[in-house]
Amino acid sequence: MNIDKVKKLIEKSKRPVVLAGTGINISDTKTELFRFVKKNSLPIVTAWSHDIYPNYDKFYYGRQGSIGNRVGNFVVQYADLVLVLGSRLNIRQTSYNWKEFAKNATIISVDIDPLELNKNLIKIDYKIQMDLKNFFIKINKLI
């Protein structure tokens, strides 16, 4: 999938959400994530890594999954587009009923690890194997 398609899906979406994971810390892209969310006015939830996005920001809806809060989980479940950035989408995020995870959403996952992108649990509609630094460079040129 090319980055232009991601841009178009974000623009078309009525209820998008960014789900950011530990990959943001590993790739040292907190600043890029913050700019991307602000520039596009996108709701954001985080996985286990509660330190990757400021919890005082108006676009932050909390954590998602079994360790998350109600609002964070609602935002994901009722989204029509989930942009997963650097998250494994493990069982604590998706629950044991992973087929119901964001069931009405188009899911785009950006991860450097092909094994995480190709797990047989979550339905990922668009898989982008790419370092998050490169992803943010490319997407920010388009949006």
What are these regions (language model features)?
Residues 1-14, 138-142:
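Cofactor-/ligand-binding subdomain signature composed of acidic, glycine-rich
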Residues 9-79:
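Anionic-ligand anchoring segments at beta-strand to alpha-helix junctions in alpha/beta enzyme folds, i.e.
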Residues 2-3, 40-45, 102-109:
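Short, functional N-terminal and low-complexity linear motifs
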